[in-house]
Regions:
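Active-site cores of enzymes that catalyze phosphoryl transfer or operate on phosphate-rich substrates
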Residues: 1-7
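PLD/PLD-like phosphodiesterase catalytic module centered on the HKD motif
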Residues: 8, 15-133
C-alpha cells in the first residue's frame, strides 16, 4: 500500500516503532518494515521530482501509567526509546537515512502530535491529546 501511494500517506497511531535496516538480523527485536517502505517511497518521489508527503501523527508521550524518569515510567521510556530510534536517533533512523539522500527531508515527511489548551482561572493550561488506534 505504501509503495502505491501517489500523493501522500497519513499514519495515526499510538507508537511509531519500525525497522529501517535494509537487512534484518535474527537478533533484531523490531520486525515490521513500515519505516523502510516509507524510506523507499520518499526516495522514489524525491528522485522523480514528484510532490509527495508523509504525515505521521503520534502522541508526545505514550498513554501508560507512570512518570518519565522514575521507576514507574519504565514502559513509557522504552516506548519513547524505540519511537525515537525509528524516527531520528541513530544512523539507521528514518530521518538519518533520508538526510543522506535529501537535503531537507521535512519537505517529504513530518511528525505531529496534538495538544489542546484553554484558560483556567485566568491561567493558560494545556493538555496532551492521545491517539489510540
Amino acid at each position: 500500500m505504501i509503495n502505491q501511494a501517489e500523493h501522500y500517506i497519513y499514519i495515526e497511531n499510538q507508537f511509531f516503532i519500525s525497522q529501517t535496516k535494509t537487512h534484518l538480523e535474527s537478533t533484531d527485536l523490531v520486525k515490521n518494515r513500515i519505516a523502510e517502505a516509507l524510506y523507499r517511497r520518499i526516495l522514489r518521489a524525491f528522485r522523480n521530482g514528484h510532490t509527495f508527503r508523509v504525515f505521521i501523527l503520534i502522541p508526545l508521550l505514550p498513554a501508560f501509567e507512570g512518570e518519565v524518569g522514575t521507576s514507574s515510567g519504565t514502559a513509557i521510556q522504552q516506548i519513547m526509546h524505540y519511537n525515537y530510534s525509528t524516527i531520528v536517533k541513530g544512523y539507521d533512523s528514518l530521518l538519518a537515512k533520508l538526510s543522506l539522500e535529501i537535503d531537507d527531508p521535512s519537505q517529504y515527511i513530518g511528525f505531529y502530535s496534538l495538544r489542546n489548551h484553554t484558560k483556567l482561572n485566568g491561567r493558560l493550561v494545556t493538555e496532551l491529546i492521545y491517539i489510540h488506534r
